[in-house]
Amino acid sequence: MGVSDVPRDLEVVAATPTSLLISWVAGAEDYQYYRITYGETGGNSPVQEFTVPHDLVTATISGLKPGVDYTITVYAVTDMMHVEYTEHPISINYRTEIDKPSQHHHHHH
């Protein structure tokens, strides 16, 4: 098979009720940057998007709602002759944790 030239193995490596840390394995290609989109799965709210530099393989998504299914997609973008060329995106679905307010009031001495 050889080395994949597209990003792969997208996963959530850390999560809170309102934010996710995602990471992926970079492809062999020399990309300009990655575009990450996220939104509620099957929701009709607009999808948010942002970009990260090509040398990063992690991103933090914040401002999420607790206990909601999100679809997260990562695109690798190459700038060919000023035309953005997007490689095969990878997507995952992830449900954020339910916020448990009681946890915030426990102080361990």
Question: Which stretches of residues belong to each language-model region?
Answer:
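Extracellular low-complexity, O-glycosylation-prone stalks/linkers
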Residues: 1-62, 69-109
